[in-house]
């Protein structure tokens, strides 16, 4: 593998594509009393404004004591921005109606996925076994670069002044041209570099699996960074930290993960 110092930002939003599934459950409560109602025109306006923010409302459940919105977002949308925009635009709609309503500061944003965190954790942990390598010795050595952190604290809430966040991601990076790297020493260095980056950037790892042609990471992010920023950070900093030429396909997969899946939200 050629060694050189790559530019600080070889992978950027303008030259890297993403496949993604980012879904969230937002909940807000009134400071006192009950929520006022909004008519269909007001909701339509809110939905249109949120779309411009990169947020799409998938479902909503509103009672007098709690409003819950299930939303999706684009990769460049920061979790704290989702909370600010959902709450802020509803606040503005209520101010226009002169209802006198005030939100509680107690809000929450919870990441959701098609699969639960346990299912994703097990999927990552079984990568080597699932691959069915012909060489059992290679498979055994490669399995050293798959790790689960148990018990994982990724599912713990991030508590900030604006509320509570549950922010878990599953990130997949693929070696360019799907080239298979069989150098175990190199793969071991990559495994260590992932952990170093997570520590430096205050991410919490739950599972990592380094495979010859791709990489899986399950982590808890920080609410000030978007899924896109986290993915690009790993893509760039792995290469920079290992002092190698860019090795990744200029694309990635990122999906939200949580204790609950979408079916649980709909029940």
Tell what function each PLM region has:
Residues 2-267:
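Charge-rich, low-complexity N-terminal segments
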């Amino acid at each position: 593998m050629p060694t050189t110092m790559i530019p600080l930002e070889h992978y950027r939003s303008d030259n890297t594509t993403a496949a993604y599934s980012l879904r969230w459950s937002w909940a807000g409560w009134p400071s006192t009393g009950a929520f006022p109602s909004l008519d269909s025109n007001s909701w339509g306006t809110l939905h249109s404004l949120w779309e411009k923010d990169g947020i799409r409302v998938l479902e909503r459940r509103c009672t007098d004591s709690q409003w819950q919105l299930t939303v999706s977002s684009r990769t460049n949308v920061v979790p704290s921005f989702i909370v600010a925009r959902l709450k802020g635009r509803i606040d503005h709609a209520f101010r226009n109606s002169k209802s006198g309503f005030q939100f509680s500061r107690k809000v929450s944003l919870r990441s959701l996925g098609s699969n639960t965190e346990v299912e994703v954790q097990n999927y990552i942990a079984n990568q080597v076994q699932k691959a069915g390598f012909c060489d059992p010795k290679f498979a055994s050595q490669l399995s050293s670069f798959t790790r689960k952190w148990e018990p994982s604290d990724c599912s713990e809430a991030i508590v900030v002044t604006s509320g509570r966040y549950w922010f878990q991601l599953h990130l997949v990076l693929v070696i360019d041209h799907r080239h298979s790297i069989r150098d175990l020493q190199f793969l071991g260095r990559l495994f260590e570099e992932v952990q170093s980056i997570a520590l430096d950037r205050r991410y919490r790892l739950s599972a990592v699996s380094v495979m010859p042609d791709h990489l899986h990471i399950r982590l808890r992010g920080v609410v000030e960074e978007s899924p896109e920023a986290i993915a690009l950070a790993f893509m760039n900093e792995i290469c920079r930290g290992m002092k190698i030429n860019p090795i990744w396909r200029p694309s990635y997969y990122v999906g939200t993960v949580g204790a609950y899946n979408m079916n649980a939200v709909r029940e």
